[in-house]
Amino acid sequence: MTIAAPLLQVDNVSLEYASAQRVVRATHRVRFDVHAADRFVLLGPSGCGKSTLLKAVAGFVTPREGQIRLDGAAVTGPGPDRVVVFQEFDQLAPWKTVRENVVFGLRATRTLSRAEARERADESLAQVGLTGFADAYPHTLSGGMKQRVAIARALAMRPRVLLMDEPFAALDALTRARMQEQVLELWEQLHFTLLFVTHSIEEALVVGNRVLLLSPHPGQVRAELNAHAFGPQSAGSVAFQQTAQRIHRLLFDLPDAALDDAKVAPLRRPAVRQREALP
């Protein structure tokens, strides 16, 4: 069976930024495809360029070489078809209520009336379990609740791709685990397309169904893994721990030529939509 064309294509993208002393290459010729309803995770150590890559997909950074395409059209700037959830708690306007924070983005698109925007905002808040806090202000919310508002605001925009840049990194371990579960519950309801950045191997396996490994700086593709077999309930299993250890070796210990010995195939464009999960 042939597959549909990818929704998002990152084609040999190299990204650079200027420091005080020199130009730094963040990623080098990174290539991957994301299909509709994928939960695609970019996993790598700090400084590998994964957040910069997410910003390039969002349209905030222009590639030095290569191209990013959404639905076959080149990404040339930000747009409502790609919405980002960051890790910072201060991404909400503190002078607006929870509902007003969600409505603000909807009204900015100039496609919905005030009543329509309010209705969609309430629908999104219900999806993340915050109906009872619609009139609350951000300073009264916990960190996890603020991130749920940010997710509700993003999903209310109905983007083609939801971009999440280490959204739970600043949360305590218990809240982070619950937020991971809630993202998966929302995905089961809505089947949105997710591009998720993390430096946590365990989080990547729980959240993603496909995981792209990026090498230490500058970020280059090491391998792509199929993580369909894993989820919150499998985190303590032997297979989960063995896979996490294998990923660690791929990221830090093994040269590129040793990928095959780790039983993980290097990234290649798939001929079929489904792939076998790692043993």
Predicted regions and their residues:
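Short helical segment in ABC ATPase nucleotide-binding domains corresponding to the A-loop/adjacent helical element
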Residues: 99-108, 118, 122, 226
